Every structure is written in structure tokens, then in C-alpha cells.
Design a protein with these regions (language model features):
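Glycoside hydrolase catalytic-domain context in secreted enzymes
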Residues: 1-202
Length: 202
């Protein structure tokens, strides 16, 4: 969740984050920058937060200037579930839902999940009637198609189905690794006779 999601006021999910620009770049931005530059990160999701008075989903400064221009991100920017609707409904940006969608698109968001609300039919009508610049939509469409091409979805759009697809997500080795991770991450918070340790041991 890009950016400063864990620095929201009161630790509240999706709340306001008053984070100075230097802290955004040098602390909260560094893990993203490393993933982009060292691993060629191809997908990113803006957080629900409002950072310094601006919803991240509709922030040109964060999604284009910082993320793409400064950090070099070239992949697909996908909304968090319902984030475009939240931008309008909760964060009060845009006169209408489609206005909020257009602001998110212009900011650098390419795709809305889980279904189109801000990127819906009225949003598309703005492009059909010339009320919105088609180049912003073309840029987003190109990024979506590029991601699909990289995944081979044009050659094999439904390469795995049914049991074959289920098999990919239920490998025995994956289950074993998950079980081992769970075992190694357990932390005993209070010993009520679970472990054979005397009460005098600290």
C-alpha cells in the first residue's frame, strides 16, 4: 500500500496521514523504491489514506511525480478495493463519482477494483464527448495491455482452469512451508503451565 499507510493518525485504517515530504521519501518510500529499482516491480496499489490533505489515489504528486518520475516505476497502478469510491464518498474529492475517477486516472491510477464505479459508464462518456483528455485514458489502457502481454494472456488467456488451476495454489511444498512458517512464528505471551518452566524464571 503506497504510501505512509502505517503512519495514519491514531493508527486508524485509511485515516489521515500528516507525513512531511522528506519522511515520505526517505523512510516510507525507500522499500518501494528498492522493490522498483532492484526487482523491477510491475504492480502497485495506492493506500486508502489521505496524505498531507490529498487522497493518495488522486495524488498526481505521489502517483506520478514521486512514484513514476523519481522512483522510476513503469508498471501498473491498481486501486485498492473501493478506493476510487472512497475518494469521492469519504474523502470528498470531485463533484461526482466520475469526477473523482477522472482525478484518480490523471493522478496515475490505471485500473479500478473490484468493479467500475468512478471508472464507470459516466466516466467513459466524458471521453466520448471530448470533456476529458483521451491521452490519460490511452496511457492507462496501454499499461493494462502491457501487463497482460507480459503475463502471456494474449497467447493463452485461459491457460489454466479447473483442477489444473487449483493445483497451482495447493502444492504440497507450499503447504509445508506455510506450516513451518506458522510453527516458527508462534509467540507464547503467557505461560499457564503450557511449558515446563518454573515461575521463578524470567
Amino acid at each position: 500500500h503506497f504510501l505512509a499507510f502505517h503512519n495514519s493518525n491514531g493508527g486508524i485504517h485509511g485515516a489521515v496521514s500528516d507525513t512531511p515530504p522528506r519522511l515520505l521519501e526517505e523512510i516510507y518510500g525507500k522499500p518501494f523504491q528498492a522493490a522498483i529499482q532492484e526487482s523491477d516491480l510491475l504492480g502497485i496499489m495506492p493506500c486508502y489514506c489521505t496524505v498531507n490533505g490529498e487522497p493518495v489515489s488522486a495524488s498526481y504528486g505521489l502517483l506520478t511525480k514521486l512514484l513514476r518520475d523519481e522512483m522510476g516505476f513503469q508498471g501498473l497502478c491498481i486501486s485498492d478495493y473501493g478506493a476510487v469510491g472512497n475518494t469521492h464518498g469519504s474523502q470528498h474529492v470531485g463533484e461526482t463519482l466520475e469526477d473523482a475517477g477522472l482525478l484518480c486516472l490523471k493522478a496515475g491510477m490505471d485500473m479500478e477494483l473490484p468493479n467500475p464505479s468512478g471508472f464507470g459508464e459516466k466516466f467513459l462518456e466524458k471521453f466520448r464527448t471530448g470533456k476529458a483528455d483521451i491521452s490519460a485514458l490511452n496511457r492507462a489502457v496501454l499499461r493494462v495491455l502491457t501487463a497482460k502481454f507480459r503475463m502471456g494472456l494474449f497467447e493463452h488467456p485461459f491457460s489454466l482452469q479447473g483442477e489444473e488451476l487449483k493445483g497451482v495454489f495447493s502444492q504440497k511444498t507450499d503447504r509445508e512451508v506455510s506450516l513451518q512458517s506458522a510453527k516458527e512464528s508462534l509467540v507464547l505471551l503467557k505461560n499457564n503451565g503450557v511449558l515446563p518452566i518454573g515461575s521463578d524464571v524470567k
